[in-house]
Regions:
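Residue-level detector of conserved catalytic or cofactor/ligand-binding positions
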Residues: 295-303
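N-terminal Rossmann-like FAD-binding beta1-loop-alpha1 element of flavoenzymes
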Residues: 16-46
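Glycine-rich Rossmann-fold phosphate-binding loop(s) that bind the pyrophosphate
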Residues: 21-22, 50, 123
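Conserved Rossmann-like nucleotide-cofactor binding loop
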Residues: 24, 53, 196
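N-terminal FAD cofactor-binding segment of flavoenzymes
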Residues: 42-100
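Glycine/serine-rich loop-strand microenvironments at binding/catalytic pocket rims
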Residues: 1-19, 23, 138-142
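Predominantly flavin-linked oxidoreductase catalytic cores and closely associated redox partners
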Residues: 31, 39-41, 124, 128-129, ...
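Extended hydrophobic secondary-structure segments that form protein cores and membrane-embedded regions
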Residues: 16, 44-52, 186-190
């Protein structure tokens, strides 16, 4: 690991440093700039993103509840550039058997599984749109800037992050090709890295932020994005399932969203607590796509 010898780095100072240009980080940046307008006090904000561009590491196709967006950007529906344009028009929640299915009545579902008033979206495109909004308000966004470590003061406070640090070996020691990167310092540092972010894990462990939390559940998700012909496209249709091809002792479920210009986002999530060593999530996903509830879409996709 690194010794205690100080490393000289260039640095830049901001009021707020945000790590991660996903939905949370970008919305936070926009809100800070709104506060700047409301108070008349300048707030400098920088967002660093490890992907080659905003959206490059956003894999989710999602059903978006617009309530928070309504509060943040009340006029978003009037923006012709906004990619959030597919309201949920119909939905199913199914239990799958090998060759059939059983719908669960909507009245029996918890509110979190009801999608009326929501939108089927590409989160990658949504984040790109949010980034344009943020930059127009004066937020600085730096893609291809992975934050590798926190910058700490002598008393342990977080002062910012180190970005652009390369040439670190697997043992944690610098190699001959080591480049120290630079420091982005802020009065406040916001970690919006998403699930299992490397800096977030450090902070969670150090400050025991998960002390009163339930044990984390892990799963692997497999996703495909299809382009289907008009006869197989139901814009605004959302479907979630559980059951086949997973067995009773393997948790998980699936989604299918019809959105945009004849796009279908489809995927399967398999909880990683399964005990059968022969379970192969990718192969289960291939089996899942043969089910009658989605097979017609698969065939159409193949024809394209």
């Amino acid at each position: 690991m690194f010794d205690d010898t100080p490393i000289e780095r260039e640095s830049m100072e901001f009021d707020v440093v945000i790590v991660g240009a996903g939905g949370a980080g970008l919305c936070a940046a926009i809100r800070l700039k709104q506060l700047e307008e409301e108070t008349g006090k300048e707030i400098s904000v920088v967002v660093v993103e490890k992907g080659s561009e905003v959206g490059a590491h956003i894999l989710s196709g999602a059903v978006l509840d617009p309530r928070a967006l309504d509060e943040l950007l009340p006029d978003w529906r009037d923006d012709e550039a906004c990619p959030i344009d597919t309201p949920v028009t119909s939905e199913k929640f199914l239990y799958l058997g090998q060759s059939g299915s059983m719908p669960l009545p909507n009245a029996f579902l918890p509110k979190s599984l009801k999608n009326h008033g929501c939108y089927a979206v590409s989160m990658a495109n949504t984040c790109r749109w949010l980034a344009e909004k943020a930059e127009a308000m004066g937020v600085e966004i730096y893609p291809m800037m992975a934050a590798s470590r926190l910058v700490r003061s002598d008393d342990g406070r977080v002062r910012g992050v180190i970005v652009g640090e390369v040439g670190i070996g697997r043992d944690g020691n610098p190699k001959d090709s080591y480049e120290p990167g630079m420091e982005l310092l802020g009065k406040y540092t916001l970690l919006a890295e998403g699930v299992r972010g490397s800096l977030s894990k450090q902070v969670i462990q150090e400050f025991a932020l998960d002390r009163d939390s339930d044990v984390q559940k892990y799963g692997i998700g497999l996703k495909e994005l299809w382009k289907v012909p008009d006869e197989n496209f139901k814009k605004g249709f959302v479907q979630h399932t559980f059951g086949w091809p997973l067995t009773d002792d393997v948790g998980g479920g699936s989604w299918m969203y019809h959105f945009g210009d004849n796009y279908v986002s489809i995927g399967l999530v398999v909880h990683l607590g399964y005990k059968n060593p022969w379970i192969a999530p990718y192969q289960e996903f291939q089996r899942f796509k043969t089910h009658p509830e989605i097979e017609i879409g698969r065939a159409s996709c193949r024809e394209r």
